[in-house]
Amino acid sequence: MKYNPTWSFVTYWTLLGKGEIDMPDGFPPFDNTVDWCGPEDDAAFSAMVPDFILEAYVGHAGYRHDHGYATPAALRPAWCRRQYLWRLLCDYRFRADLKHIIKREIKSAARRKQAKIWVRLYYWSVRCGGWRHCAR
């Protein structure tokens, strides 16, 4: 089936695990060792962005974001073909996925509050960091 950026984080990973999502040609499978977020065209800034936000591994959100960016118009749902709107949806979904991961993985309210500051930095590193942010 076609990828839809409105799917929840859990739905996306469930369908991906079952192999039910049409993937772009040549798009690599998820690899825990390389899928982390940080703009690859700015090494100094990338070094500031961690693989983990406190205890939460967030490469899953980065992988999904890259999947959305790499999805050609033919594999997108009919309701969204415009490139700008599609990228905006992917970016918003990335932020929502980050928040979901933080909420699920970090149990302490004080630690979650700290993590939200990192989420903001992380999100803007992706928005401002170029076309692709994962180290592929």
Predicted regions and their residues:
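Extended terminal accessory/targeting regions
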Residues: 1-136
